[in-house]
Amino acid sequence: MISDKIKLTAKDILEKEFKTGMRGYQQEEVDKFLDMIIKDYEAFHKEFEQLKQQNARLKRELEEQKLAVTQVPQQPVQTPVAQPVYNNTNTDILKRLSNLEKAVFGSKLYE
């Protein structure tokens, strides 16, 4: 992620104070700080370019999907043919069978 690569914030740059030596700022300290700034800007630029490429790719894919959707021929939706509805479930059938057995064989089955 980009925040992992960036070491400085705008506030860090604004508030950075360099120690002054006998003849002004310590050149090594300024150079190190500027090197960090350069690395941050390079990281920003690289991330920005990657995001631009990703954005362009996603826009192309979106346009392709839109085109594919508009080119699909519109077919009428067929409603399924109504199947005969049987209200007899397995439990109903078992109850009826049990009642028939009782009627035919009487209580002999259950002794």
Curated annotation (Swiss-Prot):
Source organism, top-level taxon: Bacteria
Coiled coil segments of this chain: 38-72
Alphabetized InterPro entries for the sequence: Cell_cycle_GpsB (IPR011229), DivIVA_domain (IPR019933), DivIVA_fam (IPR007793)
Entry annotated with the keyword Cell cycle: yes
GO BP: cell division; peptidoglycan-based cell wall biogenesis; regulation of cell shape
GO CC term (a single one): cytoplasm
Subcellular location: Cytoplasm
Keyword set, alphabetical order: Cell cycle, Cell division, Cell shape, Coiled coil, Cytoplasm
Major subcellular location class: cytoplasm
Oligomeric and partner information: Forms polymers through the coiled coil domains. Interacts with PBP1, MreC and EzrA.
Entry's family note: Belongs to the GpsB family.
Function as written in the Swiss-Prot or TrEMBL entry: Divisome component that associates with the complex late in its assembly, after the Z-ring is formed, and is dependent on DivIC and PBP2B for its recruitment to the divisome. Together with EzrA, is a key component of the system that regulates PBP1 localization during cell cycle progression. Its main role could be the removal of PBP1 from the cell pole after pole maturation is completed. Also contributes to the recruitment of PBP1 to the division complex. Not essential for septum formation.
Name used for this protein in its record: Cell cycle protein GpsB
Native source species: Bacillus cereus (strain ATCC 14579 / DSM 31 / CCUG 7414 / JCM 2152 / NBRC 15305 / NCIMB 9373 / NCTC 2599 / NRRL B-3711)
